[in-house]
Amino acid sequence: MGRPLICMTLTCDTLAENVELVKKYEKEIDLVELRVDFLNEDEQLFVRKFPSMINLPCILTIRRDVDGGLFSGGEFSRTSLFARALAFANQDTAKNFAYVDFEDDFNIPSIQDAALAFGTRIIRSHHNMSEPVYDIVEKCNSMRKTGFEIPKIAFMPKQLSDVTRLFQEGKKVQGDHILCAMGPEGMPSRILSTFSNSYLTYISPKETMQNVKEVRQLTPYEVNELYRFKSISENTKLFGLLGWPLVKTDSPVIHNFGYRKFGMDACYFPIRTPIVSDALHFADYLNITGMSVTIPHKESVLYYLHEQSPEVVNIGACNTIVKRNNKWIGYNTDAYGFKRSLEEFIGDFKIKRKKVSAEVICRDFFASFEQGVHHRQ
């Protein structure tokens, strides 16, 4: 199996606006998904011509509101739109939709047969916008009506362990399939699609990201430049930033830039969870050998460490954990970084006629800081 494809979701009001986005990003993606449910009603009547307006394969999707989409016109109207979009197949298959997304409960034999006859591959999808899907292997097998269909499961995880299960189950699914955990906690499933054997990962351009904010897709920049999605393989070293809720962080930018600069096959990404044990189980399964630790886990992570550096023992907090010989070892690089910066800025100096080293200042600073944190709590 090759690397997962990058599919950009198109959610503009008009076909013309969607075409412009395809032209802008076509060198960074492999295919697009036309979300007909986002189009103006007048525009929906002309979706048949869209594949001939672009130079990339296209998925036809008309997502119902119950599945997280905008279409609320009823199944008869939606079926008519599907039929209209797939009709009059062109002998040049590049001018037809390459894929069509049918939900697992959408069973209209005439339209399904037409899609197969025209060479349009069916993605058979199941969406749960409020809960995880537990029986992923069984669900994928039951949705695959023919050998040409691609089962797709997208769900909203309740905790990181649901995402871990997605990776575990993904390895067991036979044939092409698409797996995606939505929302901030599910982001690793989009970045690391290789590790779930997913056929593709969905992204959205920054111009329309607001339209899919609830499911939290990646942007073309994030998938290509920040996480270097196309180069991720089973051999890529994985590292993460453990925290909650991690609304905004520059750590992936800093670390991944460093990996690229020094030619390292590595990827650093956010691991969002309020439960430390879930993160460690996630890391164990994906063979993540190091994590930065930030709020609120710098103290709670101590319980799970097999060893602690002297700095961690003295300060009572940990900001870095490394796995060696199947044991998690905790370090605190905040103290070292502060000490180094202080030495460079002022060196050793005299206070009240006593020479005080930067090391002593750092020790007192972090001890006072930790006490302050406890008092505020």
Regions found by a protein language model. Name each.
Residues 236-348:
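Phosphate/diphosphate ligand-binding glycine-rich loop within oxidoreductases
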Residues 349-377:
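Glycine-rich phosphate/diphosphate-binding loop of Rossmann-like nucleotide-binding domains
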Residues 1-124, 129-133:
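Active-site beta->alpha loop and helix N-cap motifs at the rims of alpha/beta catalytic domains
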Residues 80, 84, 135-140, 337-349, ...:
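Active-site glycine-rich loop that binds ribose-phosphate moieties when present
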Residues 90, 104-237:
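Catalytic alpha/beta core domains of metabolic enzymes, predominantly
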